[in-house]
Amino acid sequence: KIQVVFTTHSISLLEEMLSIKDNVIYLIDNVTSVFQMEEPDIYKIRMHLQSLTRDDIYEDKVIPVFTEDDEARCLLDLLFNYYQRTYPAFRSVSSLFHKVLTNISAENLTGIFTDGKLLHTTMRSICILDGDHSSDITNFIVALPGKAAPEAVLLNYAEKLYDADDSFWRDRTIVDKGYTKNYYLSNIKNEVDSFGTQLDRMRNSGETSKGKRREFNKRLFNDNRNFFILLFKHWINNPENKSEVDRFYRELHTLFLKVAPYHEISPKEWP
């Protein structure tokens, strides 16, 4: 076999050689010594050729993340905080996700991300829907954990903890902040029961109740946001929910690997 050895500073040529798995050796000039780069890739080579740091390389590079609303972004932040504490590999990439501050319905987001003519645009972004929808990795869509709308997940979870007299209600942080069972009864459960009666009255009189439950849940969440934040932290750390929390992490990782190259972010940042 004929072997060819040559040197180059051409980024495009190096990128092509790496893509076809050619043997690329990159030597790093460290002033007083020269050593071979371990596992060279185009991102590390570009950084060294341009005398940049990792922070310089990724300063303006982010992956757009679209969610349905502010409530979803709030819970997504809590999930990210959990993943940073639990998975060291996630710590270096969490800041690369840019949560777009816009409210778009699940139906509209799904329509955008499944539109074949927009694929070139949407494949550069990640869509995160509430848990009452399904993930669609092919179209860059992932569903939040919980298998229901976030507010519904938390309301059901609060009721479950209340009925079970869970130790959550005796946790020092919860008690010190005043979020006792009495708080739950007065500010949340009574409101839920009252709204349920109101919905029944509307249905019996022939009035439409479409969307009313969702609107009520969102208002209740925002009126008691700090309580629900603590509740969701407990939900995330509950072993009963580990499969859902881990499923979301895995699917988010898969989408990161698909989307990162479009933003000149090395997939190796999240191995």
What does each model-found stretch correspond to?
Residues 2-5, 123-124:
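Loop/turn-to-beta-strand initiation segments
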Residues 7-10:
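H-loop/switch region of ABC-family ATPase nucleotide-binding domains
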Residues 23-24, 51-60, 111-114, 142-154, ...:
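Short secondary-structure transition/capping segments
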Residues 88, 162, 166-169, 260, ...:
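Residue-level signal for secondary-structure boundary elements
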Residues 98-103, 142-145, 231-232, 238-239:
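Short acidic-hydrophobic, aromatic-tinged amphipathic segments that line or gate anion-handling sites
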Residues 123, 129-213:
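Activity-critical C-terminal alpha-helical subdomain
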Residues 173-271:
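Charge-biased C-terminal accessory regions appended to nucleic-acid-, cytoskeletal NTPase
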